[in-house]
Amino acid sequence: MRIVTATALVMALVGGAAPAAVAQQPTAADGIWRMDGYGTVLSIRNGTLQEYQTTSVSCLRGDSARRTGPGTYTTPDGTVLTVRTQGGRDRGSIRADGSVGDRNLHRIQKLPDPCTRPVPEDPLAAFDVFWQSFEENYPFFSAKGIDWHAVRDRYRPKVHVETTRDELFAVFSEMVKPLYDSHVAVQDGARVFAQGRPGTVPPTAELDAKVKKFIVERDLEDARNLQDFANGRITYADLSGGQGYLRISGFGGYAGAGAPYAAQLTELDRALDTVLSQERIQRLKGLIIDLRINGGGSDALGIRIAERLTDIPYVAYSKRARNDPADPTRHTRPQPAYVTPAQAPRYTGPIAVLTGGSTVSAGETFTQALMDRPGRTIRIGQPTQGVFSDVMSRKLPNGMSAWLPNEEFLTGSGRTFDGTGIPPHLTEPVFTKEEFDKKRDSALDRALRVLRNHGGATS
């Protein structure tokens, strides 16, 4: 089973070779399990974990994983899933490396009946599964003012047995377009429809390279100790006024494409050990963390960085998922994600976090993880993109796929920032055409003034 962490969708569409299986013996986890939320049933037997994606009108086989160690199963794309039974044998949990939190499991006696019957593959069947997948899992229709039932009534009459694949792809794309949710996508092979919040720009590799070159030439010309880490995804420099500049363009890809989470974590720790060395944090007067072009990745890697920025434990956020197909107001129990001070040198001084509309997904959960950080933390720039959830991959009977969020990330007061994004304390333009043309970086300049003049207080 693939549990897609909060990341750019294009990264999630790449698979890999299946891992080798170890000798298989029955385990306490063998059997059939229903997952709280997520519309998922799991079958575990003979060393194979098989996902079934369910709605009230369908059951389709999803991804599978092979047992590769005690309680661990590895998917074809290299994600390690850890399955545990809890208390008696009828409750359990599953966790994907790189994700934050567990998903609860309840043992059931057998697969639901629809999982044992052939699934029609005609366009109408695909439409019904597509619509129902959003109806039962998408949390934000009300907040976005979308009547999903009216959407069905408008578009279902356009679909019939002779509807072509191109026509159906266009229908699905039109249906989800008004959501303006960059964690929503329609996939048909290499063809993908996805879009972000209006007025924002996706954090592509090309934009990342352009911005990095701009910052190095404009802002870091006189910097010391300029260094790239983690396959170029992290950059650090000491600035002339005693501040540090830390640029993070994603929370993944640190050890190269396809590398397992453990390798990503090793590369991140290696970077942090250099950037936040004991000698440096003793003289650092302020730290700028630049997330303005950040395509997301692993929430857990963001928590790992936050653990190097505090001496006091605190809750980063709590995470919950829709848990009733018929009632969008019912959720799983909120599961807190904790920031625990790392057993390594830690920087606890003032921080300025730079964000914008190209701060996406795990870039946003990391921003949220710093909101209640003890000490002075200020956000400067523009609101983030407004997508936080892990991404559900839903297969359709005709071979297409739908991608959608079903989770909310809550602050201590129960607030979410889906749709609107996390707002800055201080608003500045971020990489507009005028900023590029005039070689200005207003957000970074504001961060320097705040840190140098006020030690992190707003101005």
Regions found by a protein language model. Give the residues of each.
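Flexible, low-complexity junctional segments that flank or bridge functional domains
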Residues: I3, A23-L287, L291-A321, V391, ...
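C-terminal soluble interaction/assembly domains
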Residues: G381-P397, A402, G419-H425
